[in-house]
């Protein structure tokens, strides 16, 4: 159906705009509301639907989303910022905490670093990124701080070594 809006959007995406997008009228801000603020709130509403869907339809009790814990940790990197802007902070923190705890239960972090030896991106995805994200929403939490201090210690003792001058 050439008039089906969602179908046209998909077709536009996969066909490199071969037939153009359906018409779209940008919503206007109410009187007295700055356009940037209106659009920011609209954007946050869209993102809330995104995170709600992932938590409601994909996250399981163990804490993962089904994409493998390391890739799942990529998914939640934007959540602390959203929570700090007021998008369901308790819910997003609970979801992030469940994922971080699953990473540690699964043995993906040993002595502060990734258990597996891999390139720097994938080593970070093995849980250090989830621990870092946790600190934004759990400032001063003993377990979060302990996990990150183990990472700092590992970097200090095994990764970033002094040069011949002792620096």
Predicted regions and their residues:
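Glycan-recognition and catalytic cores of secretory/periplasmic carbohydrate-active enzymes
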Residues: 1-167
């Amino acid at each position: 159906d050439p008039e089906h809006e969602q179908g046209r959007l998909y077709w536009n995406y996969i066909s490199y705009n071969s037939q153009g997008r359906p018409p779209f009228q940008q919503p206007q801000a109410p009187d007295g509301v700055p356009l940037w603020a209106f659009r920011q709130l609209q954007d946050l509403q869209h993102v809330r639907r995104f995170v709600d869907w992932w938590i409601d339809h994909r996250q399981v009790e163990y804490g993962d989303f089904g994409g493998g814990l390391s890739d799942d940790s990529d998914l939640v990197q934007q959540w602390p910022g959203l929570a700090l802007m007021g998008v369901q902070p308790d819910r997003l923190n609970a979801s992030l905490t469940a994922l971080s705890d699953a990473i540690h239960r699964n043995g993906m972090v040993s002595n502060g670093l990734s258990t597996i030896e891999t390139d720097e991106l994938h080593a970070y995805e093995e849980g250090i990124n989830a621990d870092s994200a946790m600190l934004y929403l759990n400032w001063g939490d003993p377990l979060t701080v302990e996990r990150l201090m183990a990472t700092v210690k590992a970097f200090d003792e095994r990764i970033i070594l002094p040069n011949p001058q002792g620096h």
